């Protein structure tokens, strides 16, 4: 595999890497607090029914699609991260760097979360298989739970986390800052 000509640290500057690390810290620490303070599938109203903290576990892909596919999801996420790093490195002029940083922070947060078995009300341990099903859980911790307008197809938006928020913010930034005509030329 041929490495890009641009030096790595001219694209992934120390300040950008620190931002990704900070986003990763916010994501994993928020998940830790939720997993140690709540029980599985517990829901705590924060702003009435509009916003609740609801502990759920996503063993699938985006928005909980293809549940109970933890290992394929782990490999797919790892592959996506490697792809994003090399794509960003090769195309450093495409999009706003902060958009990429948000996406990377979120991708790393959910990727690392998949390496742990969660024990609600207690903590977590490294591993991929719960020893006590129903008490221990695998998958990404989701806990931000918002009501969705009734005229749409479902009552509540799927629960999400800080990492998911980072990815969404990053994608919006990239959509508004990428030069789509320039991408067509490459």
From Swiss-Prot:
Q: Which biological processes are named by the entry's GO terms?
A: proteolysis
Q: What is its EC number?
A: 3.4.23.36
Q: List the keywords (alphabetical).
A: Aspartyl protease, Cell inner membrane, Cell membrane, Hydrolase, Membrane, Protease, Transmembrane, Transmembrane helix
| Segments passing through the bilayer | 8-28, 44-64, 66-86, 97-117, 157-177
Q: How does it sit in the membrane?
A: Multi-pass membrane protein
Biological pathway? Protein modification; lipoprotein biosynthesis (signal peptide cleavage)
PROSITE patterns, per database record: SPASE_II (PS00855)
Q: What is its main location?
A: membrane
Gene Ontology CC terms:
plasma membrane
Subcellular location field: Cell inner membrane
Query: Which GO molecular function, any one, fits this protein according to its record?
Result: aspartic-type endopeptidase activity
Does the keyword Protease feature in the UniProt annotation? yes
- PANTHER family in the cross-refs: LIPOPROTEIN SIGNAL PEPTIDASE
Q: Which HAMAP family match?
A: LspA
Function comment: This protein specifically catalyzes the removal of signal peptides from prolipoproteins.
Give the family per the record: Belongs to the peptidase A8 family.
| Name of the protein in question | Lipoprotein signal peptidase
- Which gene name does the record give? lspA
């Amino acid at each position: 595999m041929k490495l890009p000509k641009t030096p790595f640290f001219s694209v992934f500057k120390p300040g950008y890497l620190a931002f990704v690390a900070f986003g990763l810290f916010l994501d994993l620490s928020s998940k830790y607090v939720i997993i140690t303070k709540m029980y599985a599938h517990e829901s705590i109203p924060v702003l009435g029914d509009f916003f609740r903290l609801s502990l759920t576990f996503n063993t699938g892909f985006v928005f909980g699609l293809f549940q109970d596919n933890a290992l394929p999801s782990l490999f797919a996420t790892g592959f996506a991260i490697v792809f994003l790093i090399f794509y960003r490195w090769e195309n450093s002029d495409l999009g706003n760097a902060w958009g990429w940083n948000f996406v990377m922070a979120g991708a790393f947060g959910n990727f690392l979360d998949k390496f742990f078995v969660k024990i609600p009300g207690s903590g977590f341990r490294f591993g991929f298989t719960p020893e006590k099903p129903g008490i221990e859980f695998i998958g990404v911790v989701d806990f931000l739970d918002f009501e969705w307008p009734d005229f749409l197809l479902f009552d509540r938006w799927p629960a999400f986390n800080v990492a998911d928020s980072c990815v969404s913010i990053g994608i919006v930034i990239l959509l508004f800052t990428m030069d789509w005509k320039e991408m067509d030329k490459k």
